[in-house]
Amino acid sequence: MDSFSLLAALFFISAATWFISSRRRRNLPPGPFPYPIVGNMLQLGAQPHETFAKLSKKYGPLMSVHLGSLYTVIVSSPEMAKEIMLKYGTVFSGRTVAQAVHACDHDKISMGFLPIGAEWRDMRKICKEQMFSHQSMEDSQGLRKQKLQQLLDHAHRCSEQGRAIDIREAAFITTLNLMSATLFSMQATEFDSKVTMEFKEIIEGVASIVGVPNFADYFPILRPFDPQGVKRRADVYFGRLLALIEGYLNDRIQSRKANPDAPKKDDFLETLVDILNSNDNKLKTDHLLHLMLDLFVGGSETSTTEIEWIMEELVAHPDKMAKVKAELKSVMGDEKVVDESLMPRLPYLQAVVKESMRLHPPGPLLLPRKAESDQVVNGYLIPKGTQVLINAWAMGRDSTIWNNPDAFQPERFLDNKIDFKGQDYELIPFGSGRRVCPGMPLANRMLHTVTATLVHNFDWKLERPDAPLAEHQGVLFGFAVRRAVPLRIVPYKA
């Protein structure tokens, strides 16, 4: 053995000995042995959430991994998730911030990444009590129904022409239309208007950058060099989206000044203008602009992904599709666009959405958390600064929680009261605790109404009947986990 090989072997043995003794001494959660420099990154594969789920069966629901130089604990059970998100929610309220999120100082202004403090509480209060309150949702329902009608008209045109619909594309445009109507009262007369497509292009750009693996996130020493150009590209897309949103806000402010006696619109923009004009307001315009950015990027990408999964599962399971159609027919009759007030009378539709969220949480590892101080959980030490990932995908596929967990069986939710609103830790696609997704009330309504509109008015078939579905084609891990190949299905009247 030459001297270099001997030195390398001695280094590896020394590092391994130090690592093992250090872990035992500090009683860290168990986990796979990390390689020098790269840690466990080479073990992750294309679907990290699936890899973590498999490893957790060996190492347990609290598991240590090293992602480059970033020490991380993976949480894979409802019991441990509740400990992290509820019992020790204050300790684990911090965020690990990806380099892309530093674009336009988003990490310093966004409610999603701000530390828990006065600014965060003020923004959270605005979301809960004003923007996403039940009354606010009710007031803006009419605007969303108009956008659902545009989706229906688009599907009718495709049906008449025998043309397939790219469900991801249609869901993305519809979600943007629903959100822009709710936020801005945008009155675009076309399904795929120029403004909507501009939003789409920018948001897809943001999502592609935020979702791409970035070496600088795992090796912070590289951040000043931005080797993959992630920060530079993120600055461009974040800047464009913020400028677009600011334009709408300024237009509304000027309109209010020019016509102070004009009736107010039932949208979020009116709420934001009122907040800015309030004497006791402590927030700046930038806080509200970045809040809107979070809503557009987070809401459109995740809702789009989930709608595509719902439609795939229903097309793949005609018996479940028939049950949803029968329920919608009995409740809606000849009405074409569902009213949001009918949702409590559609338990099977609700069960379908829950089952899809269980199998396909759009963000399978949720947004990363960070320990703000040392904390012992389940007998293991989680040191200050540790990144914590909640594997919602693993909990949704856990055979100790769910019977036949890989099967699409909405009926399982007809016999229990489990919901995805953050109280039942078996099903937490929107997170839980103080960091739960603030836009969940709007996302919940969009998922149900878009699905109902598509299913109630048409039968559906694959563009290529011989085409395999996603389980055989693979999925793409990124900002949201979606199909590798877009779902293309043909609407028709049976």
From Swiss-Prot:
One of its GO terms (molecular function) is oxidoreductase activity, acting on paired donors, with incorporation or reduction of molecular oxygen, reduced flavin or flavoprotein as one donor, and incorporation of one atom of oxygen. Keywords: Heme, Iron, Membrane, Metal-binding, Monooxygenase, Oxidoreductase, Transmembrane, Transmembrane helix. It is found in: Membrane. The keyword Lyase does not apply. Its EC number is 1.14.14.65, 1.14.14.60. The chain crosses the membrane at residues 3-23. GO terms for biological process: terpenoid biosynthetic process. Monooxygenase that oxidizes ferruginol to produce sugiol. Can oxidize 11-hydroxyferruginol to 11-hydroxysugiol. These products are intermediates in tanshinone biosynthesis. Belongs to the cytochrome P450 family. This is Sugiol synthase. It comes from Salvia miltiorrhiza (Chinese sage).
